[in-house]
Amino acid sequence: FPEIVKMCRKAGIVPNFTTSGFGMTDKIAQLCKEYCGAVAVSWYRSTYTDRAIHMLLEAGVKTNIHYVVSKSTVEEALKRLKSDVNGSGNGFPKEINAVVFLLHKPVGLGTTEEVIAQDNETFQEFIHYINENVFPYKIGFDSCTVPALIHMNKIDLNSLDTCEGGRWSAYITPDLKLLPCSFDNQSQKWSVDLKYKSIEEAWNSEVFDRFRSHFIESCPECERRESCMGGCPIVPEIVLCKERF
């Protein structure tokens, strides 16, 4: 770990990373303070999660929480947000920089049963509560949630960007396949083998162009299409828009 964060800085890159918090030490927290821009801790509801958050905060590290929003976790998220607004003391840890909400996806260990539907009443209350209130930390969402957020009247559309896959980010698998997004890791429908192509060639390939065509062609009649571009082309069931066509 020390070697890679130092190497990043030497190359002019400010590293950020996400951790479960397991194995966090005061020494690692100090390295994060010295070399990292921010560290996100996944909200695993465990003793080591809380300990890592407090170690990072004590070291002066800009610390975020990554919270996966699913059918079974959205109610807890709403309760914690309400607690932080009304001051009842059962919210997120104090002095964090931000809570970033990540939409549950049915990939990897994620199950279809936990996918949130657009008409989920608790989820609708959750995003409307965020729309209407001010919190003691920043609120963020992953780009998968954008189709739901563009309908909120107090969220600046200029602060949102939809799916970045194949547009300004990509994912490299352990066996050197370039994918527009890690969600494609199982089917690898849009995979380019970096053993035979450079990253630039893969990025400009016909395979990646096919992936990007989704954003160009989706929902042509929608007045908000520039903000959403039809949402996720890999897992369409997570697109939170009742007007999608």
Where are these regions (language model features)?
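A short acidic, often aromatic-flanked loop/helix-cap motif at beta-alpha or helix-coil junctions
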Residues: T47-Y48, S72-V74, P106-L109, C144-I150, ...
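A C-terminal junction/extension of Radical SAM enzymes
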Residues: G91, E95-S187, S227
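Radical SAM/AdoMet-radical enzyme domain recognition
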Residues: F1-H104
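Generic domain-boundary/flexible-linker signal
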Residues: D26-I28, D50, V74-E76, G110, ...
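A structural signal for well-ordered alpha-helical scaffolds and beta->alpha junctions
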Residues: F1, T49, V74, D119-I127, ...
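Generic structural signal for secondary-structure transition and capping sites
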Residues: G37, V61, F135, W168, ...
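Flexible mid-to-C-terminal extensions adjoining Fe-S/redox cofactors in radical SAM and related proteins
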Residues: K177-L178, S182-F245
